[in-house]
Amino acid sequence: MIKANVYSCSKFRFLYRRRFLSQSSFVHSLDANVSSLIAAVKSCVSIELCRLLHCKVVKSVSYRHGFIGDQLVGCYLRLGHDVCAEKLFDEMPERDLVSWNSLISGYSGRGYLGKCFEVLSRMMISEVGFRPNEVTFLSMISACVYGGSKEEGRCIHGLVMKFGVLEEVKVVNAFINWYGKTGDLTSSCKLFEDLSIKNLVSWNTMIVIHLQNGLAEKGLAYFNMSRRVGHEPDQATFLAVLRSCEDMGVVRLAQGIHGLIMFGGFSGNKCITTALLDLYSKLGRLEDSSTVFHEITSPDSMAWTAMLAAYATHGFGRDAIKHFELMVHYGISPDHVTFTHLLNACSHSGLVEEGKHYFETMSKRYRIDPRLDHYSCMVDLLGRSGLLQDAYGLIKEMPMEPSSGVWGALLGACRVYKDTQLGTKAAERLFELEPRDGRNYVMLSNIYSASGLWKDASRIRNLMKQKGLVRASGCSYIEHGNKIHKFVVGDWSHPESEKIQKKLKEIRKKMKSEMGYKSKTEFVLHDVGEDVKEEMINQHSEKIAMAFGLLVVSPMEPIIIRKNLRICGDCHETAKAISLIEKRRIIIRDSKRFHHFLDGSCSCSDYW
């Protein structure tokens, strides 16, 4: 019977969404039995259909049968019609605890914690005086996660203790999650430690909340502990652990988790393998991403799109286009996310005509209306190609209000081409949209500095100070010995600093003698002398990280560096030179994309 109901539910949804039946004829065709009507209500997607089903219920069966009244209440709430739900609930001849829980659950699903408290109060003072149970409090906690205050959460905690429901592991897990989301890890850990029986969800929750609070390494410690006490990881475990690997940026750790995924029999799980593919890409291992993708049996649209995103982020636009065409060839329908990555790939590779073609194809062939992300990509594509007025024209023609992402793309292009007039317009709009984002002020200041407008640049920097905005400091990260090493500008804090600085001098000497290289001091946007500029630019964090990488990373392995800001022009040229002189492969991920340096060239073709 249960299988039949599930089948019926999916069948009803299919028929209705495909519009094989009109709403009225769809309802008329239903058998007048409780099981069929409950299945139809559960799959209901419109208020019109809900009302027709409500009429069918009134004419055909009684609210007393099969909890159908509860299902209708939940349906009305799910569709945003609170008044109808409340009216129906009040008209129900018999209301048990399930009925009250349905009402609370409906409000919880929409984050209406105040309404949940109101219904809970009514429930307890009603004639019968129902006692809240595990289901009641799970809904309450869920609503609290949406946006409840700490006081409200603690109030629910107190009620749970009062009614003796804190022994239920599901309720405790929900509280562990809620306290973690509020940043109160002490309370989460206390609840976890006090649990007499910790299930896998308990351990998974501890991994996730530590990750969310910037403690990925501590979360992984809970993962290891869960395995030691005999819990086998499931899909949720691996997804959380893979996110932790991304946060920590340790490739060897990711490879170890990959082995556990294979050993645990999850290599056929498309959700996990897609996350693994994405992780390798973000860690600079594009080849590993490709290997994982090609090992997936019948990859779905998410896997195809993830691989497309990998090519885009790494700047391999032509490969991204080939991948997209192959995806379409195999009958996988692209969605708006697919086109965002495809247009991004075109933007990162300077493929203007291709980008225009796919932007047009998206709406004409696939009936996908362009969204803000698509316009951001197109503005970036046109702007970085030097077509600043075309980019600005596209913004003015947009059918919706341009977002900060759109104006940010234009401002970035203005920085490249030193267009102070258009850059000022873009920055002013960004100041309105994102008044607390210091990056926009820094960008405009840099545009003025690059154009020699030192007074204007100083004015913007002073404006930043007045607003209390702080410029983010540049730092670079590199993995070695299962540890992430961090470097900042002019960094001498590392134990191997003397060796690093010696290597840095050696590199500069080779670059000058073998290539006649001169530092690109125009990228130092400070009104100081040339000698000072050269000294400043030679101590950028990514250069220090590259020197360290040359010392410790095996020649058989690429030197992979992460930079929190955009790589500067001189560091970009230096990386190309080092890759040629030292015959090393260098991969740098900055705030925008990956750069693959080999034999004196970069994968971005200097288009970045």
UniProtKB/Swiss-Prot annotation:
PPR repeats lie at residues 30-64, 65-95, 96-130, 133-167, 168-198, 199-233, 234-268, 269-299, 300-334, 335-365, 371-401. Signal peptide: none annotated. GO terms for cellular component: mitochondrion. Residues 406-481 are annotated as: Type E motif. It is found in: Mitochondrion. Residues 1-28 form a transit peptide. Gene3D superfamilies: Tetratricopeptide repeat domain (1.25.40.10). GO terms for biological process: RNA modification. Residues 482-512 are annotated as: Type E(+) motif. Belongs to the PPR family. PCMP-H subfamily. This is Pentatricopeptide repeat-containing protein At5g40410, mitochondrial.
